[in-house]
């Protein structure tokens, strides 16, 4: 196959959903390329084109409200010469007001545009089963391609600090999630003055109202370099259960696991489908359990080590070097 990817973002979803799988497919005899979304992108001879989040409303030319006619015309024109794959890893129809992209997606014009682009695709690929259950109403030809990691992540030696570190990484859209664990984290810091807390990405430290400073590191522009910033001994993955959050993937817990980090995560999809409670980490069902589970891990180094090793073993089953065949089969199905 000759496959071309068109991505809305270079890192994050762009890395996991477009660049990483296409790079791996290139290692197995397929000709692949990718570039940022724009309505002047051409096929360059590709027989499969994968478009991430095509359509909608934004200030960007590729998806702007004033450009919807151009985008739709461009997308339909590609249909004449290649199999069309619409790639989606979030539900654009259930974006929450706290999300910075709320004004971009939550309007009738954006919804109609996204639906139109999905409807004319030969295949829609999504990252989770829940997302597939929703999008199948728009296009019945759906393939679930769950997020994978590069095998090299399993051998990354994370930085180790003198003080035990509890950590979290995420974007501004997770503000409600941090709120769910803030009390437990604050209580844990008060009881354990000799530990550190480290946030990577959005600066949501103010949500915790911590008794002392929480260390903060801004996002790294390269996904592979971002992995090297993670110095956590314990990872947290809070997630407020909402209609939008239900479609999220397990990638945060998978990243922690690959680095041998036990996780304390909210007992909701997607995390409960990946984290093995009591084996690779803990699943929290009630707010007070955050402090309890963190205390157990802080006080038991042997448990942290065992859970971390179990987590890494689990993560080894989720490498793109094994999982690329799912992308290969999905794309071949529409040729």
PLM feature spans:
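N-terminal pre-catalytic "stem/leader" segment of glycosyltransferase-like enzymes
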Residues: 1-56
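Active-site proximal beta-strand in glycosyltransferases
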Residues: 49, 79-96
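Donor nucleotide-sugar binding/catalytic pocket of nucleotide-sugar-dependent glycosyltransferases
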Residues: 119-155
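Conserved acidic donor-binding segment of nucleotide-sugar-dependent glycosyltransferases
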Residues: 275-288, 296-302
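Membrane-proximal helix-turn-helix segments that form the acceptor-binding/catalytic region
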Residues: 74-78, 92, 104-124
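Conserved catalytic-core segment of nucleotide-activated headgroup transferases in glycan assembly
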Residues: 5, 9-24, 148-153, 161-230
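Nucleotide-sugar-dependent
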Residues: 94, 176, 221-258, 265-273
């Amino acid at each position: 196959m000759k496959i071309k990817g068109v991505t809305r973002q270079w890192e994050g979803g762009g890395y996991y959903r477009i660049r990483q799988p296409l790079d791996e497919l290139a290692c197995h005899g397929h000709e692949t390329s990718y570039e940022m979304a724009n309505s002047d992108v051409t096929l360059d001879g590709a027989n499969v084109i994968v478009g991430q989040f095509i359509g909608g409303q934004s200030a960007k030319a590729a998806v702007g409200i004033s450009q919807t006619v151009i985008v739709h015309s461009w997308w339909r024109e590609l249909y004449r010469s290649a199999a069309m794959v619409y790639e989606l890893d979030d539900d654009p129809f259930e974006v929450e007001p706290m999300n910075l992209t709320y004004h971009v997606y939550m309007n009738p014009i954006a919804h109609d545009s996204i639906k139109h682009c999905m409807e004319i695709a030969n295949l829609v690929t999504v990252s989770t089963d829940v997302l597939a259950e929703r999008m199948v109403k728009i296009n019945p030809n759906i393939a679930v391609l769950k997020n994978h990691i590069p095998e090299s992540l399993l051998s990354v030696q994370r930085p180790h600090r003198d003080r035990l570190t509890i950590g979290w990484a995420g974007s501004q859209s997770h503000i409600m999630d941090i709120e769910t664990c803030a009390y437990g984290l604050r209580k844990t810091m008060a009881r354990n003055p000799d530990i550190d807390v480290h946030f990577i990405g959005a600066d949501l430290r103010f949500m915790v109202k911590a008794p002392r400073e929480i260390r903060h590191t801004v996002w790294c522009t390269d996904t592979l370099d971002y992995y090297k910033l993670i110095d956590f001994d314990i990872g947290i993955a809070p997630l407020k259960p909402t209609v939008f959050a239900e479609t999220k993937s397990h990638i945060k817990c998978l990243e922690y696991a690959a680095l041998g980090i036990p996780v304390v995560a909210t007992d909701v999809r997607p995390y409960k489908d990946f984290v093995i409670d009591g084996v690779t980490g803990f699943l929290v069902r009630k707010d007070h359990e955050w402090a309890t589970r963190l205390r157990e891990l802080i006080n038991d180094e042997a448990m942290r080590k065992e859970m971390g090793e179990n987590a890494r073993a689990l993560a080894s089953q989720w490498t793109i070097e094994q999982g690329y065949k799912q992308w290969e089969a999905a794309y071949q199905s529409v040729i």
